[in-house]
From Swiss-Prot:
Family: Belongs to the UreD family.
Protein name: Urease accessory protein UreD
InterPro entries registered for this protein in UniProt: UreD (IPR002669)
Gene Ontology CC: cytoplasm
Highest rank taxon of the organism: Bacteria
PANTHER family given in the database record: UREASE ACCESSORY PROTEIN D (PTHR33643:SF1)
Length: 274
């Protein structure tokens, strides 16, 4: 096995009406907290921690997440992913997710913060069987600079592939290189600083849901730009441009709340972060 800076493996299964950890293993700069259950629900919730506090030059990370039949998992992080300067090699993170029949994964990580002169590459591959559901988000901020400048990182590269029954149904590649792109120009970020992406794949998705989401979002006085797009298979993608993490999260929360109530009769998730 490759010697990663941080490695995490989590396999879950449904047993006696609750989702439990069938197998859990981690080492290095990754750690999993013990699961908890919101409102005594069957869905297991886990926090991923990075005890090191941030990602540095040449770090490599890998997560392998597996949900057995009818398992339900909410996976989040304890804090933002801080990418410090990388003078030689980029930070690389691989995320591999497998969802078996009838399972549900809500993957809600904190924002990515690229510090000045940092480089980060993330590759996410999701394999879904029929009847599974995925809700996954990513937030990219304008980064951190000691002088307060925006977009002073070298590169943020996020590549996501989702397969349903071994067929590629979504390929999303975001590559931001401020040195060669004018990210504040027309057609880019313009006056905004944060980019949010929510991916939802589920056979429960239909056009009436998209219309409902648009209707609700239009009443919320959101201070952002957003767009919803249907996928080739039942599912959608939400893109958000905003000026803060909080505004991106407001848009995400509206969609997430409606989906949880409509599909699973569950109350909204409040993780107490933003």
């Amino acid at each position: 096995m490759t010697n990663y800076t941080g490695y995490l493996q989590l396999s879950t299964e449904k047993k006696r009406g609750k989702t439990i950890a069938q197998d859990m293993y981690f080492y290095g700069a990754f750690k999993l907290m013990n699961p908890f259950y919101l409102n005594n629900d069957e869905q297991a919730c886990f926090y991923i921690m990075n005890p090191g506090g941030g990602y540095v030059d040449g770090d490599t990370y890998r997560m392998d997440i597996h949900l057995a039949k009818e398992a339900q998992l909410l996976l989040t992080t304890q804090s933002a992913s801080k990418i410090y300067k990388t003078p030689k090699n980029p930070v690389v993170q691989e995320i591999n997710i497998t969802l078996k029949e009838g399972s549900l994964l809500e993957y809600l990580p904190d924002p990515i913060i690229g510090y000045k002169n940092s480089r980060y590459k993330q590759k996410t591959i999701v394999h879904m069987e029929k009847g599974t559901s995925l809700i996954a988000t990513d937030i990219i901020t304008s980064g951190w600079d000691p002088k307060g400048n925006l977009f002073s990182y070298h590169m943020l590269d996020l590549n996501t592939k989702v397969y349903l029954e071994d067929n590629l149904i979504l390929l999303d590649h975001i590559r931001l290189t401020p040195g060669s792109q004018s990210l504040s120009s027309i057609g880019q970020f313009e006056e905004y600083s944060h980019l949010g992406t929510m991916i939802v794949v589920s056979e429960y998705t239909d056009e009436s849901l998209i219309s409902m989401l648009y209707d609700v979002m239009e009443t919320q006085n959101l201070k952002c730009r957003y767009g919803l797009s249907m996928l080739s298979k039942p599912g959608f993608m939400l893109r958000v441009l905003a000026s803060s993490t909080q505004e991106v999260m407001r848009a995400f929360d509206i969609c997430h709340k409606l989906i949880r109530m409509k599909w699973y009769k569950r109350s909204p998730v409040f993780l107490g972060k933003y």
